[in-house]
């Protein structure tokens, strides 16, 4: 059995059960483990409680229980500059961003990794549900987590080969109930702590109220694609393509009582387009354009790829043909897809392996751009 005691692994600890068990497993495997709590957002909940302070207390309790040193590091400036400014800019542009993808790329596997290296880390580890496989030549492949419902490779798709070579995902071969069971058996104080939901810096807050603190809302007209006025919308930034709830219009406005969905946006005229039916024609597209396209392994500057893709988290894979040119790609769907949303990630897979991905710029229906921003 190899001696892991000379290998230092710095674990990103959030105060949740996943990162707690990550640290526990590495400690049990004999690694030299250090726990780091990242404070990325100055956050207070509705009751005036700083949730980061509460989470840090949980990190301290777990680190003490399993016998590892721990530190807290503040990345609020890096987070604001690299993630939150991007988040706001995307909403200003009428898009629907995915800050978790950018947070992993810029904070958890860049700012945090850089800091860990100053502590002498050989690797960093997180509680993500993903796996890494290492070839003899050192090339790292990122694989889906075995818990299909928890697999987080979608959010890790922008990681580079260099970042992956320094990364361990100890939970990738486990299912979530097994992780909780390990925490309970070890008596960890976080064993029954509920999972966090929502965007990291918003937490459980009301999204509309949160966003309006940073971007002024601009109400405008809500229209059907054939020109009927359906009333006022609260501001384009509050709606995403394919959204059903929150429109304030019921089935009585249409002839068939089918539910209403957001089917388009016109940023220049501040119009929100709505239509009836889950598979409304305006929601269906046959291809997309992506930018910031990136692969986890070295690829040619220009190539074509047959693979599968996800266009949102937890979506089943769809067959696609990808034409890559530099950091841009045209992605052609084998079957029409619903509600392809500019700003979201498109992520490519070859079987179990996550190959990388990009950010969706536009969706197309038979060569015509969809009115999604």
UniProtKB/Swiss-Prot annotation:
Residues 98-100 are annotated as: Interaction with target base in tRNA. GO terms for cellular component: cytoplasm. Residues 150-152, 312-313 are annotated as: Interaction with tRNA. ATP binds at residues 12-19, 38, 127. It comes from the Bacteria. The keyword Amino-acid biosynthesis does not apply. It is found in: Cytoplasm. The active site is at residues 103, 200. Disulfide bonds join 103-200. The record marks 128, 344 as: Interaction with tRNA. GO terms for molecular function: ATP binding; tRNA binding; tRNA-uridine 2-sulfurtransferase activity. Keywords: ATP-binding, Cytoplasm, Disulfide bond, Nucleotide-binding, RNA-binding, Transferase, tRNA processing, tRNA-binding. Its EC number is 2.8.1.13. NCBIfam families: PRK00143.1, trmU. Catalyzes the 2-thiolation of uridine at the wobble position (U34) of tRNA, leading to the formation of s(2)U34. Belongs to the MnmA/TRMU family. This is tRNA-specific 2-thiouridylase MnmA. It comes from Streptococcus pneumoniae (strain ATCC 700669 / Spain 23F-1). The lineage of its organism: Bacteria, Bacillati, Bacillota, Bacilli, Lactobacillales.
């Amino acid at each position: 059995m190899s001696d892991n005691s000379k290998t230092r692994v710095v674990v990103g600890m959030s105060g949740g059960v996943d990162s707690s068990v990550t640290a526990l497993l590495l400690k049990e495997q004999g690694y030299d483990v250090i726990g780091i709590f990242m404070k990325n957002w100055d956050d207070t909940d509705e009751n005036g409680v700083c949730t980061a302070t509460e989470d840090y207390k949980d990190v301290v309790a777990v680190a003490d229980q399993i016998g590892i040193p721990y530190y807290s590091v503040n990345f609020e400036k890096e987070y604001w500059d690299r993630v939150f400014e991007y988040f706001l800019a995307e909403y200003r542009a009428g898009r629907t961003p995915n800050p978790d993808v950018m947070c992993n790329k810029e904070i958890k596997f860049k700012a945090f990794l850089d800091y860990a290296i100053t502590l002498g880390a050989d690797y960093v580890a997180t509680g993500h549900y993903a796996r890494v496989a290492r070839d003899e030549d050192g090339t790292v492949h990122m694989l889906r987590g075995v818990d299909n419902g928890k697999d987080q490779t979608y959010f890790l798709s922008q990681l580079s080969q260099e970042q992956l070579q320094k990364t361990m995902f100890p939970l990738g071969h486990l299912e979530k109930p097994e992780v909780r069971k390990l925490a309970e058996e070890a008596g960890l104080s976080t064993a029954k702590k509920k999972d966090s939901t929502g965007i990291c810096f918003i937490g459980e807050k009301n999204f509309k109220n949160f966003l309006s603190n940073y971007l002024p809302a601009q109400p405008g007209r809500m229209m059907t694609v054939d020109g009927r006025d359906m009333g006022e919308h609260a501001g384009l930034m509050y709606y995403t393509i394919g959204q059903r709830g929150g429109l304030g219009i019921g089935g009585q406005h249409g002839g068939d009582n089918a539910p209403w969905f957001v089917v388009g946006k016109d940023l220049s005229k501040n119009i929100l387009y709505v239509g009836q039916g889950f598979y409304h024609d305006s929601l269906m597209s046959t291809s997309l354009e992506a930018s910031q396209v990136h692969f986890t392994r070295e690829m040619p500057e220009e190539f074509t790829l047959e693979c599968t893709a996800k266009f949102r988290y937890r979506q089943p894979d769809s067959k696609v043909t990808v034409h890559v040119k530099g950091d841009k790609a045209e992605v052609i769907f084998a079957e029409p897809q619903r509600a392809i949303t500019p700003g979201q990630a498109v992520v490519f897979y070859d079987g179990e392996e996550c190959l990388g991905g990009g950010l969706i710029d536009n969706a197309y229906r038979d060569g015509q751009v969809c009115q999604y921003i």
